[in-house]
Amino acid sequence: MAKNTSCGVQLRIRGKVQGVGFRPFVWQLAQQLNLHGDVCNDGDGVEVRLREDPETFLVQLYQHCPPLARIDSVEREPFIWSQLPTEFTIRQSTGGTMNTQIVPDAATCPACLAEMNTPGERRYRYPFINCTHCGPRFTIIRAMPYDRPFTVMAAFPLCPACDKEYRDPLDRRFHAQPVACPECGPHLEWVSHGEHAEQEAALQAAIAQLKMGKIVAIKGIGGFHLACDARNSNAVATLRARKHRPAKPLAVMLPVADGLPDAARQLLTTPAAPIVLVDKKYVPELCDDIAPDLNEVGVMLPANPLQHLLLQELQCPLVMTSGNLSGKPPAISNEQALADLQGIADGFLIHNRDIVQRMDDSVVRESGEMLRRSRGYVPDALALPPGFKNVPPVLCLGADLKNTFCLVRGEQAVLSQHLGDLSDDGIQMQWREALRLMQNIYDFTPQYVVHDAHPGYVSSQWAREMNLPTQTVLHHHAHAAACLAEHQWPLDGGDVIALTLDGIGMGENGALWGGECLRVNYRECEHLGGLPAVALPGGDLAAKQPWRNLLAQCLRFVPEWQNYSETASVQQQNWSVLARAIERGINAPLASSCGRFFDAVAAALGCAPATLSYEGEAACALEALAASCHGVTHPVTMPRVDNQLDLATFWQQWLNWQAPVNQRAWAFHDALAQGFAALMREQATMRGITTLVFSGGVIHNRLLRARLAHYLADFTLLFPQSLPAGDGGLSLGQGVIAAARWLAGEVQNG
């Protein structure tokens, strides 16, 4: 029984506690325990005020936390009631600086799915069903706190039945901000060549078109997809032709996860519901053109009610690729989709719930390795490593490709969704809108801006235009620091040896790096060695035409290169003009690029087209070719000369070794890993360092990663896992470097 006193307790709960049904959960728990007081949302999380002792309440709070919630901390302090409460209530949300976490969009929960499929339920076959445990979150928020008036759902006044659920603390839709039903909520429309249908008729029109082998644009949670029957080779070929996407792999949505490996099924059925890369053998019904020349395919399960309704009726795999023109950002509005995709889609399945934030599908490997972090994961906050405290607000702009930006403040960082290539005007507009919204949501005003060392980057130009103090960070230092931060390497953890492998990034003194061994801590980066610098004939064209890189390698390392059949792809080109340009240094900058080295080897083995249709195409084909070989004894090495890998020796041995192409592809990966491992071991041993870090886009190569781990098994190895190894994680690395320098007094608090 409560004491007759005005003394109580105030609990400050921080973590992922808004938009997850946390207040109704607290209310219900208080009712069960006969507690008196109140609960509310504010900018700092959830505040609970109790009249009674909170011990039992706290135990059950942790034990029965809602499925989408996460409690990071609970602080308690005495509270004096001006008037003792006689019940437990939910107070109106308040504002304040946003230190709480916003919840990512979540896949349809089992309860809503069952309700949607039950005849007689008022939301039977309703494609926008949701509750506190599932549905859109980040993609519908316009401002904080997370209440319906601050979301796109403000346009849909609740009907009496939904309003009753929304206000009933015992209902799972209590304070579920996206709650809706057929009477008061969003509805479907079908648009196709003058045809128009609504609601169930719209759904059936789309299903009929898909069964006929047509292409349908479908509005989802964070953007549009282009869909077609993934078994129908003609439909897939038509989609590729119309979208100008000849070879880039297409993601596929499966009706069920039957037959997939357990690890893949577990990832597919999480609330994040990402695309998961699995071996093609697990989905034999797909046509050959889904992921040509690769041994993996990206699969996903329905993640929203509309997708469930489609797949339940079709019972076949659907291509679900991003709804955009090639090289352009995916559409998020009906008007944009109808304009951009009219030459691709045969019909449009749209709805009238706006999308505030574009959110692409996240992509992970079966192992859990993150390749693209977006829907379902963003904007989950990331804890900064031990030692990072009271960091001032820092805006980190990332790289120009696979861009994300990062907000750093206090002891947390928030990484944006994948935004893409900043050279595109449409993506620049979406980037600015995403930043504006994130700053609004988190009440974030940066005190300084961090950008990449490349002065020509769009992001570097933006940093200079922001009229704030700026800090420059080397590209590969940021790669290494991002991996350190992911693994919670302490601020005072000391030095590590890092291997950063990618296409190119700006290094010291304007050098172009891409295959580097570094001594790194959060504040410092020392170059120790790596690949030798080789010309990039034609500049940016070298990233699109692998044969150019083979020519550059041959001119540098293979005197008699024209005698080898492996150079046929070069000899078919007008190579002599390029050779003179390289000799004179005309549009042929030097770069120690691991990505371009992969392209050269792929060209030599004939597994790369003359001109690539997507980034990484040659390297992915080379990895797939190598993966078909399960290891081989070979004579190929990359010894070290002055801390650089000796590529002249590699090419001489490799070109003169006669073996099947898959064995030669495997030997390249193995020799490269062995060469880098020996360099890292030598540099670490002489400094007494036992921890090695790996990052950069090339580290996504599973075979290279495995061979590096094999040769360095006696060290502590840190590989990226929950953040992308490539540029998608770069902005976090920029953030922790900037924060470490500020905490050390090297940067003035602007």
Curated annotation (Swiss-Prot):
Pathway(s) where this gene product acts: Protein modification; [NiFe] hydrogenase maturation
MF annotations from Gene Ontology: carboxyl- or carbamoyltransferase activity; double-stranded RNA binding; ligase activity; zinc ion binding
InterPro entries the UniProt entry points to: Acylphosphatase-like_dom, Acylphosphatase-like_dom_sf, Acylphosphatase_CS, Carbamoyltrans_HypF-like, Carbamoyltransferase_HypF, DHBP_synth_RibB-like_a/b_dom, HypF_C, HypF_C_2
GO terms for cellular component: ATPase complex
UniProt entry tagged with the keyword Glycoprotein: no
Effect of R23 to E/H: Loss of activity
UniProt name for this protein: Carbamoyltransferase HypF
Source organism: Escherichia coli (strain K12)
Source species taxonomy: Bacteria, Pseudomonadati, Pseudomonadota, Gammaproteobacteria, Enterobacterales
